[in-house]
Amino acid sequence: VTGMTGDGINDAPALRRADVGFAMGSGTQVAKDAGDIVILDNRLSSIVRAVLYGRTVFKSIRKFITLQLTMNFSAVGVTMICPFLGIDSPVTVVQMLWINLIMDTLGGLAFAGEPPLQAYMREPPKRRDESILNRYMVNEIALLGGATVAVCLLFLKHPLITSQFRATEGNLCLLTAFFALFIFSSVFNCFNARTDRLGLFAGLKKNPVFLGIMLAVLVIPVSYTHLRAHETLANL
């Protein structure tokens, strides 16, 4: 990848031929038109910051894709396997909407606040044809998704777990607890997706929005479940 900086008319051909042409804000209009990016503050250090923030955005996109595919893989896997185990519709339509709309949206907002790390600048440039979904992400999605499916199926079928819940029509108590388990596993997957080979809690202080969103994801469905349960008991 070749970058070229320039501010004069004679720099225009090189700015056009470079992979990325950086024209100075104080340069000629010809140079600005030929370049891909105009550096308004006329500082070469701005190029370094632009690369850093660009790599941070690229990392955040990959984190969100990892989270989304892991959650969808888990939900689809549980939904497809459960009928063979005698469990019908472990995830309702409303719950699936919560997973796909609320969790995905909040997950995207949480990753948007990820701080730029200087470690990103030590990585080699990305190839033009490099897929946004790399082998590490595929392995992570398969491992975490498979583990989530296994834990969910164990929760739904193991006698030591199912015996802890009151027998109701349609196993409502068990399935409600199962949905809470799925939410907790989704939050864990959020923490795991954001670290990318780092410690699970690395850099959390630099992204307080992430902690707030994860707390809301946990509190809202659990609180709603308890409120609905108390309302149902009051009407009996």
Language-model features: locations:
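Acidic, divalent-metal-coordinating active-site segment for phosphoryl/phosphodiester hydrolysis
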Residues: 8-18
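Generic leucine side-chain signal with a strong bias for well-ordered alpha-helical environments
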Residues: 15, 233-236
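Cytoplasmic-side transmembrane-helix entry/capping segments in multi-pass membrane proteins
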Residues: 203-209
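Conserved small/polar residues in nucleotide/adenosyl-binding loops
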Residues: 225-234
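Conserved acidic donor-binding loop of glycosyltransferase catalytic domains
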Residues: 24-25, 236
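PDZ/PDZ-like domain micro-motif
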Residues: 14-15, 31, 211
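Membrane-embedded transport module
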Residues: 1-3, 18, 25-197
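Hydrophobic alpha-helical membrane segments
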Residues: 189, 209-222
